[in-house]
Amino acid sequence: MKQYYFPPSGDCGAAFAARLAEMEPDSILNLQSGRYVFRKKDAAAFPFAVSNANADDGTLFERHAAVLLRGMRNIVIDGHGAEFWFEGDVSPIFLLNCESVVLRGFSVHFFCPRVSEMQLVRKEGCCAEFLASADSPFIIRENRLFWLDPDGVPEAPETVIAQSASAEGLRNLRSDFNPVRAAVSAERVGERGILLNFESPFPGMAGDVWQFRNPARNEVGILSDHCSDITLESLTLRFTPGLGIIAQMSAGLEFRKLIHEPEPGRICAAFADCIHISSCRGRFVLAESRFCGAQDDPLNIHGTYLKLERQEGPDIFLRFMQPETWGILPFEQGDHVALVDGHSLVRLEFRTVRAAELEGSHGVHLTLSEPFTDLPEYAVIENMSAYPDAEIHDCRFAGYPTRGILLTSAGKCAIRRNTFIHGSGSPVIYISGDAGSWFESGGVTDLEISGNVFRGSGRSVIEIVPETAESSSETVHRNIRIHGNRFSDCAYPYLRVRNTEDLSCDIPPAFISGSRGK
């Protein structure tokens, strides 16, 4: 392979883009140990639709891709220990329509992460004193605390949500109580100290770390869109905005030896999910990786249900219903799609896609091999071709407030030999599917959950619970094997299940809630 080189630089965005443009297929870009600084002024800015990360008001976010790989084939970026540092509110890396790309051996950092943090130093009566992290700038204006975003813009207290973690970060939960909003006054104490006054005694514990973010996912971490054969290996992600690694309409993804954990002295490493896989196909592998400090699920794998609005012969007209997912086309010519009853999630009929196109921001027009014969009262469409065969093994998941893994894929899937350290009120592994809220499809057909270790779950550890009508007894998930897992300090039940058949499980019946399946 042809060798290219690029040295560390304190302002390398434009030159780095130029070097990428020089690269031919079958080549390697070699970096070296040192700091590579990318600034927002050099980022490629353009509107772009991202699954589960669009504005819920129908406005398409303008993204700022600090490193943009578009249409590249058979290349490797080998960091050799390089540090990528990002200044401003940007998306670190975009891969668009790429094939056979390897990213390895570098780390991702932000000078000012999009999640601000402060640690409770002491409290006395209705007063509480905090120490802001060194990379969380703030101002006090009219006796109120305003965090500054990565572009230096104050975030109104009303726009930020809160999360509270123990000092070591293993307990890391969302909080309905928001100190920034609840404070009746605020004052600066020295360079990084913050004194907040409340109407009643502060409920937190000394040492707790409070985290704050505006939940808009206007930027993401590493995006793979319409790519194939993408490998991420030996990457250290100290912070990612939006969805950490988001792959949509991509095939053949292999992520190995990732460390998605925060900088020393911080709690948060991921603004939302660590990894989000939406409407992908082929093989997905996540192996030998560590995750800690997410504000949402460490791993989410799903397709998308679209509402069937009308049928005209072989032509059907669909609509995205989830407010953050629209403007993408998760169908290709030749795909096999299912007509699904939106209440029971039962697949009723199957057809082949002859043509697919977007219609406006929220619509999709499909031409099918033949019309559906009998439409239910509430119908949604599921793309049976846009599911990966997923393997998740030998990973560690800790310090997150929601599910550890959410998986609704009709491919052949396995979750093996992972460790989950979990203390939230959500299931650790969630096999769901719904056509009423997130619209994340669909029914599992082949899943193994084996050899995992679960520690400290505050709710049912594994939930196989599709969001169907309460009266529905129809099967949604099938062919699931749960064997050889260990549970330590976990709440009852270890397994909650319904609308499932062909379930093989060695969990004692006393620790199971619901039917073991048909």
Which residues are covered by each model-predicted region?
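Extracellular beta-strand solenoid repeats
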Residues: 30, 68, 76-78, 85, ...
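Small/polar beta-strand repeat architecture
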Residues: 172-217, 349-350, 354-390, 398-399
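Extracellular beta-strand-rich solenoid/capping regions of secreted or surface-exposed proteins
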Residues: 17-21, 38-76, 85-104, 112-126, ...
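Consensus "Asn ladder" position of solenoid repeat domains
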Residues: 106, 235, 258, 289, ...
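Acidic Gly/Asp/Thr-rich repetitive segments characteristic of extracellular carbohydrate-active
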Residues: 2-29
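Short glycine/acidic-rich loop motifs that flank beta-strands on beta-rich extracellular proteins
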Residues: 40, 86-92, 112-116, 218-221, ...
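The right-handed parallel beta-helix/beta-solenoid scaffold, focusing on the short coil/turn
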Residues: 27, 34, 65, 73-75, ...
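Ser/Thr/Gly-rich low-complexity blocks that favor extended beta-strand/coil architectures
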Residues: 63, 86, 110-112, 121, ...
